[in-house]
């Protein structure tokens, strides 16, 4: 029996670890797999040599630095005995590892591109030197790498796979249509006429800055008709202070489910910028993006982030792909509950405006429904590593 080639999959965060597990399900029959990840990857057949870290506070950050050094040491040692590496996001760590892999003559596949289109654009020069193939998850990224003559393919986004699999538990089929909202609400006993999801972020610092806004928004709507959902996935650290204040409201549910379950049953969502904006686009739930940094962080961000007009991923995609559509409203730094409540009401009750937003989200969604990212990455691996 022919010995299988050995590959190393390296993820640095919980999302990357999940994406790594999805491709491992395809790869495990053709390759021996080792890697840095977590439970998802281990369950998918990857022999772990290191684990991802989850750090929020200052003390945890010190622990994280130590863990990263340990993981880099283990990964460097493992490089000697693998045919190639699959690096998932986490660029500061993974681009350094790619450089070491390249020196050893190992093939390098990079999955989920660094956001070079927004900041630290010069990283593309390093990528060109140390990466053999880029598997990108946003449609406009493909052209960026092609211009630099870097082998690349837009593979779709693995988040769509996850959503399609899990929403099947709550709807009659795997369609992600708007008609399924009522069915999902029934599963959770939510009977109100209007459902709004509030997503204050995943980190304590983000959540702290959004608490006043979220509490004010709840007060601005008729509690007999409107129900608010706050998703609390395992990787979201909602503070005790926030939970105490928000759970006293009779028309608020803190839902211990992944955020896209809440988004799928909602009429409107108020979201901190991030992957959740893409989730909302995929289920075509109109959204408002709210974003607030500390004044210093905002000033630094304005200095280093160049070439993008928006922060919400659906808007960024639309800008790069030159879509002639409406854009999702973004409230940055100035988070006025009155203005945001007005925008929510417009999305709920102005039928023309609501339909324009839903159509726009449908146009974004189409980029992701035609490809299964993990299967596409598997095909690339078969060509690159065999």
Stretches found by the model and what they are:
Residues 1-386:
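Nucleotide-activated sugar donor-binding and catalytic core shared by glycosyltransferases
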